[in-house]
């Protein structure tokens, strides 16, 4: 399984979330299969987007596209950190 972990600050969570939700169709078309949105315990505008993808190549192409750069700018995203991850193990305790 392939995952992407993105950590970034946003100027306004509600505005960011609306744009994030509006982009659901294009994220799905690009290969995103599921996601979590998490928020920092001490900073409501520091967001983590953790998602499962059909392939890392598709995820990279999507997140590095000019269209997504513009969407992030409109959403008020500041300095995103992208981590492209391969699953090694999963368990339940």
Predicted regions: what they are:
Residues 1-70, 74-93:
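Short S/T/G/P-rich N-terminal loop/turn motif that feeds into the first structured element of a domain
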């Amino acid at each position: 399984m392939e995952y992407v972990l993105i950590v970034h600050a946003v100027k306004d969570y509600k505005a960011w979330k609306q744009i994030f939700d509006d982009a659901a169709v294009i994220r799905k078309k690009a290969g995103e299969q599921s996601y979590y949105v998490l928020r920092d315990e001490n900073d409501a505008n520091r967001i983590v987007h953790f998602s499962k993808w059909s392939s890392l190549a598709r995820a990279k192409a999507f997140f590095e596209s000019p269209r997504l750069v513009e969407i992030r700018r409109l959403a008020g995203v500041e300095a995103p950190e992208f981590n492209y991850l391969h699953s090694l193990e999963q368990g339940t305790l």
